[in-house]
Design a protein with these regions (language model features):
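Active-site proximal loop and beta-alpha junction motif in alpha/beta enzyme cores
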Residues: 1-191
């Protein structure tokens, strides 16, 4: 979802090669470039174009919420809710989400202090809710860029830990900037 890439880039830039400005990772489907930024690390992900889903019947029961629109990206469903409060207060049925044919389910709405807010549910992957899902923002930013008619977007993922991201939508890529912090440092001894 981007965590491992961001953490790897943070480790590379801060401990393995402090003079480096960028590193390229080979992901499942494409390369992901990580670049040092003034305010964190920018991951350049392939743009994910939303495809509108017309049958909304399974989404309202799974989310216990009124659903405005549903889209499908490469991996995830994306559900548009009424407002930030609907996203923040959502209490989903993870069993119904787990039965869906996708990696995960994103809920989103226009933000009050940022351009858009979201949450990402992925019980199919063993993670009921992810704190900050970089890969989901390739779809989210592409969608909201079209709604707001701008390419430079601020985002907040409303998980318990809250993730703040900056997204820049380009022709074929979405640049997502976030921050990483050193949590633990140690030595591993292998015998």
């Amino acid at each position: 979802c981007g965590h491992a890439t961001l953490a790897s880039a943070f480790t590379y830039f801060n401990f393995l090669n402090p003079d480096a400005h960028e590193i390229v990772f080979q992901a499942n489907r494409s390369e992901i470039k990580a670049v040092k930024a003034n305010n964190g690390i920018t991951l350049s992900l392939p743009k994910d174009e939303p495809r509108k889903i017309l049958d909304l019947s399974t989404f309202s029961p799974a989310l216990n919420a009124e659903v405005l629109e549903v889209y499908k990206g490469i991996d995830d469903f994306m559900v548009v809710l009424e407002d930030e409060a609907a996203v923040a207060n959502n209490e989903p049925d993870f069993n119904l989400i787990k039965a869906m044919d996708s990696r995960g389910l994103i809920i989103t709405a226009k933000g009050e202090e940022v351009d858009f807010v979201s949450r990402w549910y992925g019980p199919q992957t063993g993670i009921n809710e992810d704190p900050a899902t970089g890969s989901a923002h390739a779809l989210l930013a592409t969608y909201w860029s079209g709604i707001f008619n701008k390419s430079d977007l601020s985002a907040k993922q409303l998980s318990k830990r809250v993730g703040l991201l900056h997204c820049l939508v380009k022709e074929e890529k979405v640049d997502i900037t976030g921050q990483a912090a050193l949590y633990l440092r140690g030595t591993l001894q292998l015998n």
